[in-house]
C-alpha cells in the first residue's frame, strides 16, 4: 500500500487503515505494530469476546442469542473506545445478528454504545453489508438495524457509511448508500465522508 501511495501520489490520496479487535492483553502489541507498519488509523471491530488461546470456546458476538453476551459486547466496545486507539466503530449493532427479539437488554446495550460514542466523539459505522443479513427464515434479527439507529439519534453521534470488503459481491449494496445516508440524515444523524484528521 505504501508503494501504491507513492506511485499514484499525483492521482490518489491513499490512507492505510485496519479493522482490529480489542483484546486488552494484546493492546500494547497492537499499538506497536500500528506504529511500526505506518497504519494511519484503526477501526474497532469487536467480533469475539476473547482470544482462542485464552478460551478455546471464545464466542463470536454476531453468533450468539444470549442477552448476557449482548451486554458483554457493549461493555467490551465501551472499554475499547475509551482506549483512544480506534477512529470509529464498525457494525456497532453486530451483537443483534442472531438474536430473535429486540428487548430491553438489547436496547440498553445499544444505549451504552451510543452514549460512549457520543461522549468520546467516535463515529459509528452504518454497515451496508449487514443489510444482506436481514429477514432470515429463522427469525434472527440480523444487522444493520433501524432500531439501533433510532436510539443513536437520541445521542449526539456521527455516522460513517461503510461496506465490508470480504468478497466482491458485498459491493452489490453500494447503490443503496445514498438511500441509507438519507435515512441517517432524516434521523438527524450527521454522516461523515471522511474521518476527522484524515482529510
Where are these regions (language model features)?
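Charged catalytic cores and adjacent phosphate/nucleic-acid-binding surfaces used
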Residues: 96-97, 101-199
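Extended substrate/RNA-proximal surfaces in nucleic-acid metabolism proteins
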Residues: 1-120
Amino acid at each position: 500500500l505504501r508503494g501504491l501511495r507513492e506511485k499514484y501520489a499525483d492521482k490518489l490520496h491513499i490512507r492505510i487503515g485496519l479493522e482490529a479487535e480489542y483484546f486488552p492483553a494484546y493492546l500494547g502489541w497492537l499499538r506497536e505494530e500500528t506504529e511500526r507498519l505506518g497504519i494511519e488509523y484503526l477501526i474497532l471491530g469487536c467480533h469475539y469476546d476473547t482470544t482462542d488461546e485464552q478460551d478455546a470456546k471464545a464466542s463470536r458476538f454476531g453468533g450468539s442469542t444470549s442477552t448476557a453476551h449482548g451486554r458483554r459486547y457493549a461493555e467490551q466496545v465501551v472499554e475499547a473506545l475509551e482506549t483512544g486507539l480506534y477512529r470509529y466503530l464498525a457494525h456497532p449493532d453486530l451483537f443483534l445478528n442472531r438474536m430473535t427479539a429486540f428487548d430491553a437488554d438489547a436496547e440498553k446495550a445499544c444505549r451504552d454504545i451510543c452514549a460512549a460514542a457520543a461522549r468520546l466523539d467516535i463515529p459509528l459505522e452504518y454497515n451496508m453489508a449487514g443489510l444482506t443479513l436481514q429477514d432470515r427464515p429463522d427469525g434472527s434479527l440480523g444487522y444493520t438495524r433501524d432500531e439501533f439507529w433510532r436510539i443513536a439519534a437520541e445521542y449526539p453521534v456521527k455516522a460513517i457509511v461503510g461496506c465490508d470488503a470480504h468478497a466482491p459481491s458485498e459491493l452489490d449494496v453500494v447503490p443503496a448508500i445514498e438511500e441509507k445516508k438519507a435515512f441517517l440524515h432524516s434521523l438527524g444523524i450527521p454522516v461523515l465522508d471522511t474521518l476527522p484528521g484524515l482529510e
